[in-house]
Amino acid sequence: MATKAAFAKMNGLGNQIIVADMRGRADRITPEAAIRLAGDSETAFDQIMAIHDPRTAGTDNYIAIINCDGTEAQACGNGTRCVVQALAAETGRQAFTFETRAGILTATEHEDGLISVDMGKPRFDWQDIPLAEEFRDTRMIELQVGPIDAPVLHSPSVASMGNPHAIFWVDRDVWSYELEKFGPLLEHHPIFPERANISIAHVTSPETIDLRTWERGAGLTRACGSAACAAAVSAVRTRRTGRTVTVNVPGGPLRIEWRDDDHVMMTGPAEWEFSGTFDPATGEWSRDAQNDKPTDRGAA
């Protein structure tokens, strides 16, 4: 019988994260285990960030990302910040390089506790997002919610931050739209062969965007880092904002900078909640009796 793995329950602006220590192990977290953990009120999560041994020279770890429905994700900016906080507390280091399904990510913890993640370069070609049919201009595509002559939402910007995003621009409060109603329908729309993250965005100034997101494989979320990045770069492409903005998500603000080298930097906090151990095959878990913070004795 395999030994249990250590984990830390954390969050990035309310985006619920489990950071699981799978280093030195040959097994993987099963979809069944993920679904069981997601169904428990104490361990309910949006994503599991499973830290594995590195696969590629020059990286510190491979990070497998698992949604609460048991599917795998390519990217999770909020989860990456949680991983950095956990590993920084364990190792005393501030800078890390990770490999994910989306590619190589670098991240740094600052003296003020905020964490910056280089989310890489956005992609806008319809085949890279991907879309099921050709669109030469992905700043706006033909897609709408509601009646043809009076759509509730229409003409989203689409982009990939290693995962597909659709951003619907609106001119009033993002909370006035029933994202919980149409989010799952749009996530599974045929135009998105790999499904998509669906966001509503309201530009409130040249430096600020309000954003709500229906996250692919997770549902409504208080924060989605890659969606904030996708909204920021799409706002620049549609001439709504400058290249550095604050994206206000339900959980709080994220600072997004689309640099001149085309890389997107995301900066925000991470928060530790509790630690424990779990069975990667079944999802059976227990809370650590001591339950110290990672700054006291290391994390996941």
Curated annotation (Swiss-Prot):
SUPFAM superfamilies the record matches: Diaminopimelate epimerase-like (SSF54506)
Binding site for substrate: 15, 47, 67, 77-78, 163, 197, 215-216, 225-226
UniProt record, GO biological process: lysine biosynthetic process via diaminopimelate
Annotated localization: Cytoplasm
Swiss-Prot/TrEMBL site (Could be important to modulate the pK values of the two catalytic cysteine residues) positions: 165, 215
Region (Disordered): 275-300
EC number: 5.1.1.7
Keywords linked to the UniProt accession: Amino-acid biosynthesis, Cytoplasm, Isomerase, Lysine biosynthesis
Biased composition (Basic and acidic residues): 285-300
UniProt-recorded Gene Ontology molecular function terms: diaminopimelate epimerase activity
InterPro entries per record: DAP_epimerase_AS (IPR018510), DAP_epimerase_DapF (IPR001653)
Pathway: Amino-acid biosynthesis; L-lysine biosynthesis via DAP pathway; DL-2,6-diaminopimelate from LL-2,6-diaminopimelate: step 1/1
Pfam families according to UniProt: DAP_epimerase (PF01678)
Active site: 76 (proton donor), 224 (proton acceptor)
Organism domain of life: Bacteria
Enzyme class: isomerase
GO cellular component: cytosol
Catalyzed reaction equations: (2S,6S)-2,6-diaminopimelate = meso-2,6-diaminopimelate
Classification via PANTHER family: DIAMINOPIMELATE EPIMERASE, DIAMINOPIMELATE EPIMERASE, CHLOROPLASTIC
Function (record text): Catalyzes the stereoinversion of LL-2,6-diaminopimelate (L,L-DAP) to meso-diaminopimelate (meso-DAP), a precursor of L-lysine and an essential component of the bacterial peptidoglycan.
Subunit comment: Homodimer.
Family: Belongs to the diaminopimelate epimerase family.
NCBIfam families found in the cross-reference section: DapF
Protein name: Diaminopimelate epimerase
Organism of derivation: Brucella anthropi (strain ATCC 49188 / DSM 6882 / CCUG 24695 / JCM 21032 / LMG 3331 / NBRC 15819 / NCTC 12168 / Alc 37) (Ochrobactrum anthropi)
